[in-house]
Amino acid sequence: MTINGWIQILVFCGIIILLVKPLGGYMTRVFGGERTLLSPVLVPVERGLYRLAGTTEREEQHWTTYAASLLLFNLAGFLLLYMLQRFQGSLPFNPMGMSDVPADLAFNTTASFVTNTNWQNYGGESTMSYLTQMAGLTVQNFVSAATGVAIAIALIRAFSRKSMKTLGNFWVDLTRCTLYVLLPLCIILTLAFVSLGVPQTIGVYAEATTLEGARQVIALGPVASQLAIKMLGTNGGGFFNANSAHPFENPDAISNMIQMVAIFAIGASLTNVFGRMVGNERQGWAIFAAMGILFVAGVAICYWAEAAGNPLIHALSVDGGNMEGKETRFGIAMSALFAVVTTAASCGAVIAMHDSMMALGGMIPMINMMLGEIIIGGVGAGFYGIVLFVVVAVFVAGLMVGRTPEYLGKKIEAKEVKMAMLAVLCLPLSILGFTAIASVIPTGLASIANPGPHGFSEILYAYTSGTANNGSAFGGLSGNTPWYNITIGLAMLMGRFLVILPAMAIAGSLVAKKAAPQSAGTFPTTGPLFVGLLIGVILVVGGLIFFPALALGPIAEHLAMIKGQMF
């Protein structure tokens, strides 16, 4: 580890902390229907969209109606994207003549982008036409991110409102997030990326002659615009197969820092939106502190593991850390930081090959996802994910002091705890269930590239990434097979919607409750005691169940490596 590496990490953390309050304040005004700088331009567009949808901004929805609207919207998007891939060979904006996508891969890709996962069992520059990239994948990058934010806002309203039956309007929240938050920020990011050298074209691929006289085709496309929402919406699906390790997606250290900041910007700021909407910003900062402590701990361990390198190589008097699978223009510090950032949020973009990381270095991204990606998390998804743990934490606190659990004056009763645990337990059900099956059947084992614990880690990482809606992978797993396309697709759908529905049920229950005044026995939820309790609950309830699987994978691999055995 170097001072330069830690300075880069501290600069990133400082930028995020400085962004939380201004961006949080702006989003609070947007979802509160207040006037913003963009209102003169966007209000007419917003109202026109409401008229087309047959709704108004004043129309409110019960939680069941809100959830039904969300599910119908996502179903429509699923069908449209699937059909677009299946018939892309006959559609325009296909200058390179890409063929129709096979059914199992189209299902996997559709589930991936609709759920904000962006798991890719294909190479973007060799599989998808420009039309599919722009009208299919990029559109889902926007609306899947906006869907996550809408759920988070509905859940926040459940705490800020008292004795009501409605949580807002899904169509209004979706529209406002897209128009006022995602589009303006993406335009700024797109211009920044283009200025740094990222391509933005719908022309044919370029041709070049190498120094040896060979002909080389250089893939191009509308990269910058997709890159912007890929990062801001924590989608992660790359235009190119190499993702953000490709120089056309990530030319230099400046673009790399911008991309990492974009990944965390909205998720971190939602904690401030929460504090503002419930009338106590310290509540938001407490949640942000818990996220931040877990994040910094993960970065420190991952950076240490990668900087320490392989002990078997140390015996050859080679020092310099583990540079395998990393870009020299980024180095170990930025590669480790990016790996933790992309898995702490449900992004999945990569600048280094996670499969080439040291056993403990690769375990940290896996743990981030196993916790439900609530360390900042995806846009919206991270916030409503950590609120589920907040519900469990205050329930535990209530049991310890012998009082009915309360959070922000709302009583946390059996229904809320059951729904929270249902959502929390769906992750291990999917991850461990699919991993167990794939680890014993020939179809599952045929796709792994390495024997022993590392091969098991490849399978475990794949289902963890899919269920947690991340999308990154251990590249040694050949995932483009009918088995993995279908099962990982199902894991992605389970990880998205089996968490959303319990979260919406909790919101519907809480919004109808009165807020009790604070008393001397009320458990404080803005101090270090609550932050520590929340972190403990996250690690014990969310993480401990995965320890046996981790022991069979990365931990066993690390111990074997110490003894001189590699896989």
Swiss-Prot record:
Transmembrane segments annotated in the record for this chain: 5-25, 64-84, 136-156, 179-199, 254-274, 285-305, 332-352, 359-376, 421-441, 486-506, 529-549
Gene Ontology cellular-component terms listed: plasma membrane
Entry keywords, A to Z: Cell inner membrane, Cell membrane, Ion transport, Membrane, Potassium, Potassium transport, Transmembrane, Transmembrane helix, Transport
UniProt subcellular location: Cell inner membrane
Membrane protein topology class: Multi-pass membrane protein
Family annotation (PANTHER family): POTASSIUM-TRANSPORTING ATPASE A CHAIN (PTHR30607), POTASSIUM-TRANSPORTING ATPASE POTASSIUM-BINDING SUBUNIT (PTHR30607:SF2)
Oligomeric and partner information: The system is composed of three essential subunits: KdpA, KdpB and KdpC.
Similarity remark: Belongs to the KdpA family.
Protein function: Part of the high-affinity ATP-driven potassium transport (or Kdp) system, which catalyzes the hydrolysis of ATP coupled with the electrogenic transport of potassium into the cytoplasm. This subunit binds the periplasmic potassium ions and delivers the ions to the membrane domain of KdpB through an intramembrane tunnel.
Protein name: Potassium-transporting ATPase potassium-binding subunit
Species in which this protein is naturally found: Brucella anthropi (strain ATCC 49188 / DSM 6882 / CCUG 24695 / JCM 21032 / LMG 3331 / NBRC 15819 / NCTC 12168 / Alc 37)
